[in-house]
Amino acid sequence: MGVPLLDVSQLQAGPEARKQYLQALVQSFRDYGFVRLTKHDVPAKRVQRIFDLSTQMFNLDIDSKLEFANIADGSPQRGYSAVGVEKTASLHGNLIGRRVDEKLTDAREHFDCGSPLDKSFANRWPEKLQGFQQELESFYFELEQVTAGILGSLEEALNCPPGTLNNMITKENNASELRLNHYPPVPAGTLRNGNVARIWPHFDLGVITLLFTSAVGGLEVEDRNAPGPQTFIPVEPETEAELIVNISETLQRWTDDHLPAGLHRVTIPKDLDTEIQNDANVEIPGRYSIAYLCKADREADVGTLPVFQTGEAPRYKAMTASEYHRSRLLTAY
């Protein structure tokens, strides 16, 4: 069946349509940790503009990109990270208590920026690209608003008091990040040798993630309903403006596992499987994505929220989002 595609405009189509949308939203998150959304508030032309800027930035020579490189010290990521720097296999392995071979790397480079209002961790920008900073800062605030709407829908669907989730993510202290991903062209054999993946299976660290992907596929999510061994299924958006949303670790903690985080990976697109079976030298095309990683305020408690405590001992103890994210990020580099 695959990850459902929901029409956000149903929220305004009357009480029954609204109820059905909210029920379907929660069910998709429980089944897959993911949902696909159409008729949201981000125009297709706006998404395309950010993809164009992303392409320009990643096309800079490596020396230029290193001028605004991220410093991997456990602090929030800011600037450029080269291919292979982030290791998602280690990130997930540490979470589930499994030792991971350090040779497992990601065939991906990325750029991260935080809120323009963040006074604690300054962004690092490519000075050679005119308008890049201004466009991304504006897009950051646009996705901030879309995120608030999705979390408001979840509050309503889960019968939470208004603000239960959104009050943990304030504009003045927003720790969320906007990320541009680039997966360079790579021989299929490189991805089949067992040591390299575009992204290894992992959970995102924040509350929810908003994702736009380019036409080249490869995103796969865990099918929790499949019998037998762990199974992944492709997520295939119909357009680049379709919004993919996934549950991340913090929301799983807040809801005491009522909404588990969505396990996902990026691999060889399914439509190329037949072609590459006979030739490991076939080149997998480059791929781009845009992710808004919604995160709780740094001093917010990421333990189980009282509204989701059932009388039994909560699964997740109190700790700040800053403490949690720092401990997790140090395993990814």
Swiss-Prot record:
Pathway: Mycotoxin biosynthesis. Keywords: Dioxygenase, Iron, Metal-binding, Oxidoreductase. Its cofactor is Fe(2+). GO terms for biological process: small molecule biosynthetic process. GO terms for molecular function: dioxygenase activity; metal ion binding. Its EC number is 1.14.11.-. It comes from Acremonium sp. Binds 1 Fe(2+) ion per subunit. Pfam families: 2OG-FeII_Oxy, DIOX_N. 2-oxoglutarate-dependent dioxygenase; part of the gene cluster that mediates the biosynthesis of UCS1025A, a member of the pyrrolizidinone family that acts as a strong telomerase inhibitor and displays potent antibacterial and antitumor properties. These compounds share a hemiaminal-containing pyrrolizidinone core fused with a gamma-lactone, giving a furopyrrolizidine that is connected to a decalin fragment. Residues 174-296 form the Fe2OG dioxygenase domain. This is 2-oxoglutarate-dependent dioxygenase ucsF. The keyword Iron applies. Fe cation binds at residues 202, 204, 264. Belongs to the iron/ascorbate-dependent oxidoreductase family. 2-oxoglutarate binds at residue 287. Disruption phenotype: Leads to the complete abolishment of all products. It is an enzyme of class 1 (oxidoreductase). The gene is ucsF. The keyword Metal-binding applies.
